Design a protein with these regions (language model features):
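Eukaryote-biased RCC1-like beta-propeller repeat architecture
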Residues: 1-177
């Protein structure tokens, strides 16, 4: 059954993807990412502390790729409400999203500038952050870990894809002489 989500009235959503029990939405500017659903591995990308098992967010919330952790809300009485404050999002700092890919419990985002971000389930290297680390609760920029035998190279992500507990990315390089 299709259901209209009133939250999106007046917002022009142009990109969507869905993970195991959560959804991602990007507006036509490419700078506003919204997420809702289950988020106990940090896959909703908007909490400061690891949510309880089964944490579920019914209404979509904005997830900035670039944020100031100092401008966040600390709620000691209810840590589940600790989140990035939307008023502190600097729109000019937000990169334009080219692609969003939802794995089972983690997210990958590709920007038009060739950068990539990931967050969510971090075990077994699922987020591609270079090691088997804890869950990544907020968007974190991916840094390619590649070496060249000669010269200095710059890398650009071309495509990202999240799977069950793994990620794949297509990266191009340009050697600078």
């Amino acid at each position: 059954m299709l259901l209209q989500v009133e939250f999106f009235d007046g917002k022009d959503i142009t990109k969507v993807d869905a993970g195991l029990q959560y959804s991602c939405f990007v507006d036509k500017t490419g700078k506003a990412l919204y997420m809702c659903g289950r988020g106990d591995y940090g896959q909703l990308g908007n909490t400061l502390e690891k949510p309880d098992e089964g944490h579920f967010q019914t209404l979509p919330s904005r997830v900035p790729l670039v944020y100031d952790i100092q401008g966040t809300r600390q709620n000691v009485a209810n840590p589940k409400e600790n989140s990035i404050i939307l008023d502190n999002i600097v729109e000019e700092d937000q990169p334009e999203i080219e692609q969003v890919s939802a794995g089972d419990t983690h997210v990958l985002v590709l920007t038009k500038g060739g950068a990539a971000y990931s967050w969510g389930f971090g075990a077994m290297g699922a987020c591609g952050q270079g090691k088997d680390e804890d869950d990544v609760l907020r968007p974190k920029k991916l840094e390619p870990k590649m070496t060249k035998s000669q010269g200095t190279s710059t890398y650009k992500f071309q495509y990202v894809s999240g799977g069950g507990q793994h990620s794949t990315a297509l990266v191009t390089s340009q050697t600078l002489s």
